Amino acid sequence: MGLGVAEREQIAKRAATEIKQGMIVNLGIGIPSLVPNFLKPDMQVMFQAENGVLGIGESPEKGEEDAHLCNAAGYPVRAVKGASYFDTTMSFAMIRKGKIDITILGALQVSQSGDLANWLVPGKKVPGMGGAMELAQKAKKVVVVMSHTDQKGRPKLTERCTLPLTAAGCVDLIITEKAVLEVDSHHFILKELMNGSTIDEVTRLTEAEIKIDMPFS
């Protein structure tokens, strides 16, 4: 089963705490797109999109969309004061130069070495990898938000990814409906429990070794 609305929002709310004042932020589609809803009103950050916008704002009301202004997923957005526009060459130059402070992405699998697989399910048609490869390699911090298991109940946190990789050794932090984990020295490190989950439950639903670094653990 997929995640419910409340679980998706809780993950996004926790991910929002990783964004700090003055950051340049890039968000993937799905749960990452919910993150701006949970930022403090006084938070001064700039959202960047691969299609060439720095300074993306909230979604417009129905009927107020600008046909020439959208995010990388093609959804209408507003621009904030001070926003700038540029071609995709400049956009990816920003990414490859390491100008993105944090990217928040979805995932199909993450390995204990921080490898990320988030673009291809064998047998399904997909448009391509998009900008995730560059973002995962070059952003200063990579946060993954996802369900802890897939729709068949199989762990998505694994010893080794079995799906085609987006990038190797890139993930810093993972937030699921069960837990918050860091990746360090080829291990998952359990930092927080979510939704009343237990250490035993998280361990059972994770297909790799977990080290525990929590208060009173």
Swiss-Prot record:
NCBIfam families the record matches: pcaJ_scoB_fam (TIGR02428)
SUPFAM superfamilies tied to this protein: NagB/RpiA/CoA transferase-like (SSF100950)
EC number: 2.8.3.-
Active site: E50
Coiled coil: none
Top EC class for this record: transferase
Gene Ontology molecular function, alphabetical: CoA-transferase activity
Pfam family, one: CoA_trans
Protein's UniProt name: Probable coenzyme A transferase subunit beta
Annotated SMART domains: CoA_trans
